[in-house]
């Protein structure tokens, strides 16, 4: 059963915003108490967060569809709906997030680093929030916006200081097992290591991580063997260690040719690996022929500029010198890195109030309107409510959409689409028509709020009659 997965395709969906509520305050002796509909709740976000305890993407391999909860709708009594709960997805340190086209969206390195993969939709406004001095009793509310949906690719690149590279069965897993407390699978056959293994090494006051990468063979950079699949784990390492087998039983191999082949594969792969500090480890010197071969090839390797160490992972020979030499290289690599300054957090809200829009006449005679505001307003409109449709028409008119349509040559009855081709609202354009004006006048205005109430008028009439009667009584003069 697979226990390590370093590349998955994930489908994330944020929660939709809750709909606003259209209601009227009801109380005894107050038949027209005014609008009191609450706003809808915000939809939950989908957030990827680095968790140091997570080492694989296996969970997302089995469950690739993840979604956050929707916001709750608003209620009467000015009660807003509850926000949807954010969905937090833990990922390993070193996870790279890409879109399906291969563009890098985020590179998550460091515990707690996060990325919002899908943003929740905003909740719709209730009619209480839509009320104004001119629009005292809106009979509608705005709908919640749908949440984002995105297909992303998660790719894990191991974060380690040192990478052990070499042919299969060169002894990389044995070496990492004796240098650290890691317990990789070790066996006497090629490709025993199928997944990268990480270990922590302490050398004096220096602590560093070391990665055992699955064996490479000729053509690994073109996809042969397992190398191409795992070469990405070498990209983040500061130091490369060539582990060469001095006791191989294959007649056509020797440490120098193995080194040349692995170097060629690293060069072909790219990723800036050519500039990494390198070290050569001649392993298995506990074997008599291995010791002789190591002493034979060492001068040639040193002539190329490599630091060479003769070790035996099985017999624990030369390990202390190797660990301290690696610590020295890691320390130099860390010192050479630019000092990380504290990140200045700048909050830049999403520009959802961009007033810009375009009107384009398409070949089929349809006028298409594109813009942040018009498209957002369309998503928030309940087209089953005539008053809401009229409110949308008023907003588009004030924004200048009608004027631009006229400039583009639109006439009454022409088709107008607002939004992209795959999700647009299409209607026949009627300029300067105020939908529902014959009933309500200004959009959302209720004349009943301005007219005298019958009960109050009767009370005033009765009071006037009593005042007149009292005045007549006071003015009465007996005979």
Curated annotation (Swiss-Prot):
<keyword id="KW-0963">Cytoplasm</keyword>
<dbReference type="InterPro" id="IPR045086">
    <property type="entry name" value="OBG_GTPase"/>
</dbReference>
<dbReference type="InterPro" id="IPR031167">
    <property type="entry name" value="G_OBG"/>
</dbReference>
<comment type="subunit">
    <text>Monomer.</text>
</comment>
<feature type="binding site">
    <location>
        <begin position="283"/>
        <end position="286"/>
    </location>
    <ligand>
        <name>GTP</name>
    </ligand>
</feature>
<feature type="binding site">
    <location>
        <begin position="212"/>
        <end position="215"/>
    </location>
    <ligand>
        <name>GTP</name>
    </ligand>
</feature>
<keyword id="KW-0479">Metal-binding</keyword>
<keyword id="KW-0460">Magnesium</keyword>
<feature type="domain" description="OCT">
    <location>
        <begin position="349"/>
        <end position="431"/>
    </location>
</feature>
<dbReference type="GO" id="GO:0005525">
    <property type="term" value="F:GTP binding"/>
</dbReference>
<dbReference type="InterPro" id="IPR015349">
    <property type="entry name" value="OCT_dom"/>
</dbReference>
<keyword id="KW-0378">Hydrolase</keyword>
<feature type="binding site">
    <location>
        <begin position="191"/>
        <end position="195"/>
    </location>
    <ligand>
        <name>GTP</name>
    </ligand>
</feature>
<comment type="similarity">
    <text>Belongs to the TRAFAC class OBG-HflX-like GTPase superfamily. OBG GTPase family.</text>
</comment>
<feature type="compositionally biased region" description="Acidic residues">
    <location>
        <begin position="470"/>
        <end position="479"/>
    </location>
</feature>
<feature type="region of interest" description="Disordered">
    <location>
        <begin position="61"/>
        <end position="87"/>
    </location>
</feature>
<comment type="function">
    <text>An essential GTPase which binds GTP, GDP and possibly (p)ppGpp with moderate affinity, with high nucleotide exchange rates and a fairly low GTP hydrolysis rate. Plays a role in control of the cell cycle, stress response, ribosome biogenesis and in those bacteria that undergo differentiation, in morphogenesis control.</text>
</comment>
<protein>
    <recommendedName>
        <fullName>GTPase Obg</fullName>
        <ecNumber>3.6.5.-</ecNumber>
    </recommendedName>
</protein>
<feature type="binding site">
    <location>
        <position position="173"/>
    </location>
    <ligand>
        <name>Mg(2+)</name>
    </ligand>
</feature>
<dbReference type="InterPro" id="IPR036346">
    <property type="entry name" value="GTP-bd_prot_GTP1/OBG_C_sf"/>
</dbReference>
<dbReference type="InterPro" id="IPR006073">
    <property type="entry name" value="GTP-bd"/>
</dbReference>
<dbReference type="InterPro" id="IPR027417">
    <property type="entry name" value="P-loop_NTPase"/>
</dbReference>
<feature type="compositionally biased region" description="Basic and acidic residues">
    <location>
        <begin position="440"/>
        <end position="453"/>
    </location>
</feature>
<dbReference type="InterPro" id="IPR014100">
    <property type="entry name" value="GTP-bd_Obg/CgtA"/>
</dbReference>
<dbReference type="GO" id="GO:0003924">
    <property type="term" value="F:GTPase activity"/>
</dbReference>
<feature type="binding site">
    <location>
        <begin position="166"/>
        <end position="173"/>
    </location>
    <ligand>
        <name>GTP</name>
    </ligand>
</feature>
<dbReference type="InterPro" id="IPR006074">
    <property type="entry name" value="GTP1-OBG_CS"/>
</dbReference>
<dbReference type="Pfam" id="PF01926">
    <property type="entry name" value="MMR_HSR1"/>
</dbReference>
<dbReference type="InterPro" id="IPR006169">
    <property type="entry name" value="GTP1_OBG_dom"/>
</dbReference>
<keyword id="KW-0342">GTP-binding</keyword>
<dbReference type="GO" id="GO:0000287">
    <property type="term" value="F:magnesium ion binding"/>
</dbReference>
<feature type="binding site">
    <location>
        <begin position="312"/>
        <end position="314"/>
    </location>
    <ligand>
        <name>GTP</name>
    </ligand>
</feature>
<dbReference type="Pfam" id="PF09269">
    <property type="entry name" value="DUF1967"/>
</dbReference>
<dbReference type="GO" id="GO:0042254">
    <property type="term" value="P:ribosome biogenesis"/>
</dbReference>
<feature type="region of interest" description="Disordered">
    <location>
        <begin position="440"/>
        <end position="479"/>
    </location>
</feature>
<feature type="binding site">
    <location>
        <position position="193"/>
    </location>
    <ligand>
        <name>Mg(2+)</name>
    </ligand>
</feature>
<keyword id="KW-0547">Nucleotide-binding</keyword>
<dbReference type="InterPro" id="IPR036726">
    <property type="entry name" value="GTP1_OBG_dom_sf"/>
</dbReference>
<feature type="domain" description="OBG-type G">
    <location>
        <begin position="160"/>
        <end position="331"/>
    </location>
</feature>
<dbReference type="Pfam" id="PF01018">
    <property type="entry name" value="GTP1_OBG"/>
</dbReference>
<dbReference type="GO" id="GO:0005737">
    <property type="term" value="C:cytoplasm"/>
</dbReference>
<feature type="domain" description="Obg">
    <location>
        <begin position="2"/>
        <end position="159"/>
    </location>
</feature>
């Amino acid at each position: 059963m697979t226990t390590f997965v370093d590349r998955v395709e994930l489908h994330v969906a944020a929660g939709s915003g809750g709909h606003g509520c259209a209601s009227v305050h009801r109380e005894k002796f107050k038949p027209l108490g005014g609008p009191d509909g609450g706003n809808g709740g915000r939809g939950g976000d989908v957030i990827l967060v680095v968790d140091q305890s997570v080492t694989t993407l296996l969970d997302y391999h089995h469950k690739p569809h993840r979604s956050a909860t929707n916001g709750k709708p608003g209620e009467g009594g000015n009660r807003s709906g509850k926000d949807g709960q954010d969905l937090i997805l833990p990922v390993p340190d070193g996870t790279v997030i890409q879109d399906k086209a291969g563009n890098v969206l985020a590179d998550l390195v460091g515990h707690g680093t996060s990325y919002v993969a899908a943003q929740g939709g905003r909740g719709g406004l209730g009619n209480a929030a839509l009320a104004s001095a001119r629009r005292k009793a809106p009979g509608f509310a705005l709908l919640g916006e749908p949440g984002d949906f995105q297909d992303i690719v998660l790719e894990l690149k191991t974060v380690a200081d040192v990478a052990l590279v070499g042919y299969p069965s060169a002894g990389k897993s044995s070496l990492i097992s004796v240098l650290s407390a890691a317990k990789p699978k070790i066996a006497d056959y090629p490709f025993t290591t199928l997944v990268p293994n990480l270990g922590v090494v302490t050398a004096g006051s220096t602590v560093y991580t070391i990665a055992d990468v699955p064996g490479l063979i000729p053509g690994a950079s073109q996809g042969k063997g397992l190398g191409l699949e795992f070469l990405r784990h070498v990209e983040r390492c500061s130091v490369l260690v060539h582990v060469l087998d001095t006791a191989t039983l294959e007649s056509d191999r020797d440490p120098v040719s193995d080194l040349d082949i692995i170097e060629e594969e690293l060069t072909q792969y790219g990723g800036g690996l050519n500039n990494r500090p390198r070290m050569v480890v001649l392993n298995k010197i506990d074997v008599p022929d291995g010791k002789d071969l190591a002493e034979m090839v060492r001068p040639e390797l040193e002539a190329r500029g490599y630091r060479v160490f003769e070790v035996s992972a099985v017999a624990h020979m030369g390990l202390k010198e190797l660990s301290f030499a690696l610590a020295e290289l890691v320390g130099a690599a860390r010192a050479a890195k630019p000092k990380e300054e504290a990140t200045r957090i700048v909050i830049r809200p999403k520009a959802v109030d961009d007033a810009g829009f375009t009107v384009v006449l398409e070949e089929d005679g349809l006028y298409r309107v594109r813009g942040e505001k018009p498209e957002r307003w369309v998503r928030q409109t309940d087209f089953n409510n005539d008053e809401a449709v009229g409110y949308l028409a008023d907003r588009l008119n004030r924004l200048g959409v009608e004027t631009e349509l006229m400039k583009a040559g639109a006439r009454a009855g022409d088709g107008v689409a607002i939004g992209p081709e795959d999700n647009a609202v299409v209607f026949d354009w009627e300029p300067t028509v105020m939908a529902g004006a014959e009933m309500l006048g200004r959009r959302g205005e209720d004349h009943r709020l301005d007219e005298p109430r019958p009960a109050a008028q009767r009370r005033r009439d009765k009071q006037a009659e009593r005042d007149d009667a009292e005045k007549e009584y006071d003015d009465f003069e007996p005979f």
